[in-house]
């Protein structure tokens, strides 16, 4: 099995553009297992309400859960985490050794967005990488 990477940019760009096409999406990025942003894009015209370093603080909890596999055998693997705040909702989706970080408008209907994004990310993982 090939390691899932975002080095093949055409796949990332395709998925990123698709995710950013949702009206409620503000930002999409990929965080590695060290908590560093590997790549990310804001929707055109969006003014960030937080610096990338502030998003990293939100990732601490998500990374901790992602790295803890203790409950996988009984509860199953982690599908995603949603953190809702007054000004933004943050969706964290584990994809192999990475976390996809997505911020949305706070009033977004999260479940339909997540289902579409999960399908998009599943499609991208099925593509054979060299």
What spans do the regions from the language model cover?
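Non-catalytic interaction/Regulatory regions outside core domains
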Residues: 1-130
